[in-house]
Amino acid sequence: MDRRLLVLAAGMFAVGTDSFVVAGILPQVAASLGVSIPLAGQMVTLYALSYALLSPTVAALAGHWPRRKLLLTGLVIFVIGNAITALAPSIGWVLASRVIAGLGAAMYSPTATATGASLVAPERRAAALAIVIAGLSSATALGAPLGTLIAGVGDWRATMWFVSAVGTIAAIAVWFSLPPIPALPSATLRQRLAPLADARITLTLLTTLLAYAGAFSVYTYVGVVFDRVTHGSSSMLAGLLLVWGLAATIGNLVAGKLTDRFGSRRIIHAALVIMALNFALTPWSSAHAVTSVLAIVVWGLCGWGLLVPQQHRLITLAPAAAPLLMGLNSAALYVGVSSAGVLGAAGLGWFDPHRLGLMAGALVALAFGMALLADRHIAAKAIVGAPAVA
């Protein structure tokens, strides 16, 4: 295995840990700073929103930078942002620091993905991308639960120091292990957004956005959605997040094989339908330990299993624009995540927290509708010779 890809994956692990660990410490953050849980939940919103908005902008403005310089700068900003979070005296400082950390992630993640793909021969590109992205999915299995456990032993600030430490280790690894890499061809922001003119691509990106807006509206407030099982125990919540992360990693790997065998369309449909039904049942499944674990497993399998066929579909539609489309898909995912914090907060104000899954299920159902519309446009284009997706 190429060591350079593992180094890039280490940075993705840091970024992923920061993305997913906050949900498990929201009650502590809210209590410590004397604010409501919905307000504390905007930590997730601002981190994800800054990533989504700044990712294409940074890529356009810093496209001429050497890759290692851009990767290191992103990780340094990421570490500084998380250190400020750990030291923040008020919710205002906390929220501002999440924007800084999001900027660092926006500089690092798309660059790492594109760099990983450029380091290998075209026939090995998918495998290289899988290794780099594995850092992100493994963060759900290891980083987030470990961070939650640290918060249980110490406090939420210790968790943010942990994230900063992981980012520092990743930066050191990039500095010493990654050789200088020439800058990739730069692209303007308009060029990056050009594929959005294709309805097939736009609808596929909307599928990603809506699906993860639904999934993360529950994840952001997972501590209160499953509190009838965890009873406020950080260790029990960490256990649930560990199960979710392991299921996510398995779902990601299995979805790759299934997509190669059956095509992206069937896997996208199956993942969305199962996920929507699973969320719709959480008002009842989250009341008992066994059904909660089952719901968490299904959620992890389908939620992360959706990413692979979505990426496969986009690359098949426009192979020459693959790096740009991966960046746009990541942006769509993070817009969904940032929207989830707001939608989840609104949901907590409207109805019982244990019914938040009903709203999540509705959003995933809308994502399924977008996927069906994408299918129609793909089939129509195939008739006149454009690439089709099975």
Where are these regions (language model features)?
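Conserved MFS/SLC helix-loop-helix module at the cytosolic interface between two early adjacent transmembrane helices
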Residues: 53-92
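Helix-to-loop junctions at the C-terminal end of transmembrane segments
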Residues: 55-66, 251-263, 348
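C-terminal transmembrane helical hairpin of 12-TM major facilitator-type secondary transporters
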Residues: 265-310
